[in-house]
Design a protein with these regions (language model features):
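The feature captures the beta-strand-to-loop junction immediately N-terminal to the Walker
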Residues: 33-35
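Conserved ABC transporter NBD signature motif
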Residues: 56-64, 76, 110-111, 117
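ABC ATPase C-loop
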Residues: 146-147
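Conserved catalytic motifs of ABC-family nucleotide-binding domains
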Residues: 150
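Helix-to-loop junction immediately C-terminal to a conserved catalytic motif
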Residues: 48
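Catalytic Walker B motif of ABC-type/P-loop ATPase nucleotide-binding domains
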Residues: 154-158
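Conserved ABC ATPase signature
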Residues: 129-133, 137
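Conserved structural motif at the start of ABC-family nucleotide-binding domains
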Residues: 2-4, 17
Length: 169
């Protein structure tokens, strides 16, 4: 279970999050909803270890992860799909997916069939450059890259942005 207790976050003198607490259980989908500018992305960044919290606790399966850097979080099975289609435009689709393998042992470095089942376009276009894909296809690539590690926790910020409604399931 992911547990957040009394999380405060500041950017300079501005308080972005105040006493946020939540629990997300294994196998559950938890959505953070709110209007623009209320701190959803800041919360994701704090959970992903890319923005330091001012105070509060973040734990996964009872272990404090709030003190870990992003590469250490990846080793613990946490994957992130940031807002804004973070892909490598000059790498092929296949190469982009393979960048998600960073923390996996060599024997486990194969794109799971489930990724291609979710996003068939990635298999069809695996030799095309990421920058040549449409916005929705780039978003599918970003999600696919996060899924190649079969994460224990998947954090996604605006995950369906630009994806055609018939692909969203």
């Amino acid at each position: 279970m992911l547990e957040v207790k009394d999380l405060d976050l500041h950017y300079g003198n501005s308080q972005i999050l105040y006493k946020i607490s939540l629990k997300a259980r294994v196998g559950e989908v938890t959505a953070i909803l709110g209007t623009n500018g209320v701190g959803k992305t800041s919360l994701i960044k704090a959970l992903a270890g890319t923005h330091n919290r001012s105070s509060g606790e973040i734990s996964l399966a009872g272990n404090n992860i709030g003190i870990l850097q992003p590469h250490s979080l990846a080793k613990k099975g946490i994957a992130v799909v940031p807002q804004g289609r973070e892909i490598f435009p000059l790498l092929t689709v296949k190469e982009n997916l393979e960048t998600g393998f960073g923390c996996l042992p060599l024997k486990d470095r194969a794109v799971p069939d489930e990724v291609y089942e979710l996003f068939p376009v990635l298999k069809e276009m695996q030799n095309r450059r990421g920058g040549d894909l449409s916005g929705g296809q780039q978003q599918q690539l970003a999600i696919g890259r996060a899924l190649v590690t079969k994460p224990n926790l998947l954090l996604m910020d605006e995950p369906t942005e630009g994806i055609q409604p018939n692909i969203i399931k």
